[in-house]
Design a protein with these regions (language model features):
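Short cysteine clusters
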Residues: 107
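Ser/Thr-glycine-rich phosphate-binding loops at phosphate-binding pockets of nucleotides
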Residues: 114
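Cys-dependent protein tyrosine phosphatase-like superfamily
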Residues: 1-103, 117-184
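Conserved G/P- and acidic residue-centered "switch" motifs that form tight phosphate/ATP-binding loops
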Residues: 110
Length: 184
């Protein structure tokens, strides 16, 4: 908790959105909604090349910023992403990281939906079970994952992915419902 508070103060000094923090240094971050052009510019200065917006009710400013691509994956507040949302996010991270680019995820407050997507990443990438992913994430972002629906989605994701290493398996084989469009 102390680390999170210290980072939050440093982020204000850098003009980053409230709650910005790296969960994988210079690869993956979570944040609350960027509300100004200055926030977007600060994200780019911090090394973020892709911003994933989960909140249809509070999108980031629409002003184009050089070096920042914004992807919308709308999820209602306190709801959980579905398997297609997870798949889009994983593919985006895979492509960005292959190019050495960092990704940041936001919802309105940077807690529930953002935390759910970040925990899903750890389930997918590090083979964590849902509970371990949330516990690990909460060491960095204490208020991550806010609803039972969000936790249940993470449990289902882990059940689908299973304990096998999936980093080299096509996503269409991990999430079978989606195989038609992604494996052709």
């Amino acid at each position: 908790m102390r680390r999170w508070l210290l980072e939050n103060q440093q982020n204000r000094d850098k003009n980053l959105p409230q709650g910005f923090s790296w969960v994988e240094e210079k690869r993956l971050a979570g944040t609350s909604v960027p509300v100004s052009r200055e926030h977007l510019e600060a994200l780019v200065q911090e090394g973020v090349a892709h911003l994933v917006s989960l909140s249809p009710e509070t999108p980031p400013p629409s002003t184009p910023i050089d070096g920042l691509k914004i992807t919308f994956i709308p999820v209602e507040d306190f709801e959980a992403p579905d398997s297609g949302d997870f798949r889009r996010f994983f593919k985006l991270c895979e492509r960005a990281h292959a190019l050495g680019q960092a990704v940041a995820v936001h919802c309105r407050g940077g807690n529930g939906r953002t935390g759910t997507m970040l925990a899903a990443y750890f389930i997918w990438r590090n083979n964590y079970d849902a509970e371990s992913a949330v516990k690990f994430l909460r060491t960095m972002r204490p208020w991550s994952v806010e609803s039972q629906d969000q936790m249940e989605a993470l449990v289902r994701l882990h059940q689908v992915i299973g304990a096998a290493s999936v980093r080299d398996v096509p996503l269409c084989l991990i999430i079978p419902r989606l195989w038609i469009s992604s494996c052709l």
